[in-house]
Amino acid sequence: MAITIVVLGISSLTTLNSFVVRNQRRSAERAEAIKFSQESMEWFKIMRQRLSWDAFYQVLLADGSPGVYCLTVLPQEMGEFINLANRACDQDEDEILGRPFLREIHYTLPDPDTIVVRVLVRWTDGTQELTTESTSTIKKWNEQ
């Protein structure tokens, strides 16, 4: 009887330990995904600042609305931004820097003075697909 209680106790501790470890890993991955999402939103706004509103809007309009960019890295050169392909990420090819995350910037152009941006960062934990999402509306302002 005592052996059974000890075995059950050890089994319970092992299960609890693996549950805690899995939750810690999932929390760390979620924090990293949120960081990628925030960086991506800031990058998109920086690209808008580097170009005039009209030039930035025209790049997006030329790619089509709604549009989506898959970003394994955040391009720093304007030419790289302008030449981004309007496409969703491929699970097998488009992970961020060897990390298990896919990053997409979705945008719509509801009118010539507005861009709605949605950043999705996705990853898989076992068989479960997880996602972080952030959304922002960018408005044209007077450029003087």
Region annotations inferred by a language model:
Residues 28-144:
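Low-complexity, Gly/Pro-rich coil/beta segments used as flexible assembly/activation regions
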Residues 1-38:
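Aliphatic-rich helix starts adjacent to a transmembrane/signal segment
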